[in-house]
Amino acid sequence: MSQLKELPFSTLQFYATAPYPCSYLPERQARSQVAAPGHLINADTYCQLVQQGFRRSGLFTYRPHCDNCQACIPVRVDSVNYTPNRSQRRAWKAHQGLRAFVAELAWSPEHYSLYTRYQQGRHPGGGMDDDSRSQYAQFLLTSRVNTRLVEFRQPEGQLVMVSIIDVLDDGLSSVYTFYDPELAGSLGTYSILWQIEQCRMLELPWLYLGYWIKDSRKMAYKAGFLPQERYIDGQWTAPE
């Protein structure tokens, strides 16, 4: 391990993982840089790490650290000046009937069932479509920071979507969203729009969306939420 000198945390270190298959670009190998020790990453520290391009998966805080590749670009949406495009306005209107319930992280068989159906319907063969209960809980229900679970339900009570969101000093970080794969409409888009509205209500300037990859169809949607900034060469800048 070596000192993470670019961050103002004298006690934090980082390590690079071994190469593993990239989930987004075929025939590529990925690596991650993981901040450690995890128990020292509290809400304040985590906020500063996110501002440096890090993300969270369970108790692991990481950012891409790939050999000869910088395709993963952190993205954050300017919630104050955000203006929806036509398809985003349609998504917002289509799902206005959903009711959102904000809660703390907790195990629920209903949530796990929806998560399993989402993975099997949207990402079959992706490695997460057979996650056990413990894997699901480690991924989404384990956190040392200020995290909320948001249920989206139909008026009659049917659960259709769940979002995991971290609350930061300067914004919200959209950790993960899963939804009923059999329902038509842009539920994922609606979740992002709902989070932008929450940023505005809380007077938080940014919604962090994780990584955008130009050549990945899975990530293309993130470029459509404007205005936004991208973290390139250690600086947040607006795309040209």
UniProtKB/Swiss-Prot annotation:
One of its GO terms (cellular component) is cytoplasm. Keywords: Acyltransferase, Cytoplasm, Transferase. InterPro entries: Acyl_CoA_acyltransferase, Asp_Glu_LeuTrfase, N-end_Aminoacyl_Trfase, N-end_Aminoacyl_Trfase_C, N-end_Aminoacyl_Trfase_N. It comes from the Bacteria. GO terms for biological process: ubiquitin-dependent protein catabolic process via the N-end rule pathway. The keyword Disulfide bond does not apply. Its EC number is 2.3.2.29. GO terms for molecular function: arginyl-tRNA--protein transferase activity; leucyl-tRNA--protein transferase activity. It catalyses: N-terminal L-glutamyl-[protein] + L-leucyl-tRNA(Leu) = N-terminal L-leucyl-L-glutamyl-[protein] + tRNA(Leu) + H(+); N-terminal L-aspartyl-[protein] + L-leucyl-tRNA(Leu) = N-terminal L-leucyl-L-aspartyl-[protein] + tRNA(Leu) + H(+). It is found in: Cytoplasm. SUPFAM superfamilies: Acyl-CoA N-acyltransferases (Nat). Functions in the N-end rule pathway of protein degradation where it conjugates Leu from its aminoacyl-tRNA to the N-termini of proteins containing an N-terminal aspartate or glutamate. Belongs to the R-transferase family. Bpt subfamily. This is Aspartate/glutamate leucyltransferase. It comes from Bordetella avium (strain 197N).
